[in-house]
């Protein structure tokens, strides 16, 4: 009786996981098929929509990089290459700022116990919605001539994601045995050398995980980029929202194609650090 009950519970658990996976995959599948549909298929009524494209085409991708669509006979002034470069530059630099500063601050708090109230203060900053302070930030950025610049957007990305990087890395540093660092200090290493040569290699996997999470946060941001950019440095989410014409309305096919392209950098980054990702997610889960 117990074996049968265990079997039913296990089967039910796997069915729930399967159902959740299918529900999660539906938008991805729909976006993928929409990206390869010709314009008449996604501009027609809802009763004519289908899962698979009847006449697959690359016209939506061509439209993004040329600004013209032969089948729709429309054109846009700005192609997708500029926003893609802007997103890549700003998200990368913002991640570099947040992870570098967050890692150094987390190590200092974890090991030297400086700023006892600093972790709680940083957590409170993270819980505070960034958009609530965007008006004074916009005034400050305008005064410093940082509106619609790569440096201005990268800097605010680094500031907003810094608390997240700090708390992740502080948790990981707390799980590193202090005895190893003390042994290195006894051998004559300076604290900076201990951090660089001993501690940092031990948290390489958690560091890779933090980089991935922070990059995804910066890469997918819409609200901050919408407020702090105008034309030259708009990002992919802002550009995607602007993909519409007076003749056709929303360019759903082009938006789906852009969504597929926008998913490539996080996926590539995840593949590059996949050997560290699982270890980083489970770092410190087991205690000796």
How would you name each of these model-derived features?
Residues 1-288:
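A hydrophobic, multi-pass inner-membrane permease signature
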């Amino acid at each position: 009786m117990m074996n049968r009950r265990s079997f039913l519970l296990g089967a039910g658990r796997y069915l729930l996981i399967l159902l959740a996976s299918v529900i999660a995959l539906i938008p991805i599948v729909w976006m993928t098929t929409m990206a390869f549909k010709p314009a008449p298929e996604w501009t027609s009524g809802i009763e004519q929509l289908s899962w698979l494209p009847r006449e697959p085409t690359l016209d939506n991708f061509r439209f993004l990089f040329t600004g013209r669509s032969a089948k729709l006979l429309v054109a846009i002034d700005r192609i997708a290459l500029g926003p893609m470069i802007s997103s890549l530059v700003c998200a990368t630099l913002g991640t570099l700022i947040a992870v570098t500063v967050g890692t150094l601050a987390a190590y200092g708090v974890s090991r030297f116990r400086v700023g006892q109230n600093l972790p709680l203060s940083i957590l409170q900053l993270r819980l505070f919605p960034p958009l609530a302070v965007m008006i004074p930030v916009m005034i400050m950025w305008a005064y410093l001539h940082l509106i619609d610049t790569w440096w201005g957007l990268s800097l605010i990305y680094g500031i907003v994601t810094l608390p997240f990087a700090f708390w992740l890395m502080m948790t990981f540093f707390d799980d590193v045995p202090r005895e190893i660092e003390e042994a290195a200090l006894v051998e004559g290493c300076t604290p900076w050398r201990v951090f660089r040569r001993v501690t940092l290699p031990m948290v390489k996997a958690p560091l890779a995980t933090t980089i991935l999470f922070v990059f995804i946060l910066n890469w997918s941001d819409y609200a901050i980029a919408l407020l702090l950019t105008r034309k030259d440095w708009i990002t992919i989410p802002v550009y995607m929202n602007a993909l519409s014409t007076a003749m056709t309305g929303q360019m759903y096919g082009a938006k789906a194609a852009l969504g597929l392209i926008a998913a490539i950098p996080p996926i590539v980054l995840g593949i590059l650090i996949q050997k560290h990702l699982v270890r980083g997610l489970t770092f410190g889960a087991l205690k000796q």
